[in-house]
């Protein structure tokens, strides 16, 4: 009685098998496991790992906080807004499966498919774990969700193979981003033929052609818009410019010139 002591404890959990009902539409869902299931045998093993490496884990965490906040010269409101979305990775919105596939809902258990028209606006993962984004572009957007006959990308891959205009333009931009963060041009060369076809699919919806999109434009607001829409046309123009840069690197100058001409036309339209 009257004494006190400090006790450290770790709250650990281990649920390597995801909910296969809600994820039943995913390819191979009947055997998918969380990636950490291959690293640890049970919750005790997780706790023992934390306990055995606690000093380093704490030191790395403190170093991150010091680097990002204490030593930063940027305003804190900017730092908060930049990093806060990364916390989503630690929720049940996101999964990393044992086959290496990254998957994300729009929100926890809501709206499937790592959907383009939501996730193309996210930036945190690409900067923190660029290899995950490169794999998702190749495996999902230009793989599982890709219509090889047309170039259309299924907005939600297996869950919905229809397209979203802002989503497909955004995915082309993401592919360029993934190339820019890659150590060499291997990623671009492996994906270029499908990436070009995906851009050509969007260009097919430019009836002019004049650098602006026409007809139905399904988008992230869960609706379909028509006509010249500055926001979506702006994404189309950006995708054209990204496509031109990649085409140049691939030695396809004629296609690059075509993309730039449309982008210039679209930019003029946006400014008037």
Segment roles from a protein language model:
Residues 1-6, 19, 265-270:
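Beta-rich accessory regions
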Residues 194-205, 235, 242-245, 262-270:
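Alpha-helical scaffold segments in carbohydrate-active enzymes
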Residues 178-189, 242-260:
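Inter-helical turn/loop segments and adjacent helix faces that build the functional surface
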Residues 159-160, 217-221, 225-234, 258-272:
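Aromatic- and carboxylate-enriched substrate-binding clefts and catalytic-loop regions
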Residues 3, 7-8, 14, 34-206, ...:
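Substrate-binding groove/exosite segments of carbohydrate-active enzymes
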Residues 189-196, 215, 254-267:
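Beta-strand segments within the central parallel beta-sheet cores of soluble alpha/beta enzyme folds
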Residues 168-172, 233-241:
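Hydrophobic faces of stable alpha-helices that mediate helix-helix packing
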Residues 13-23:
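Short, Lys/Arg- and Gly-enriched loop/turn segments at beta-strand edges
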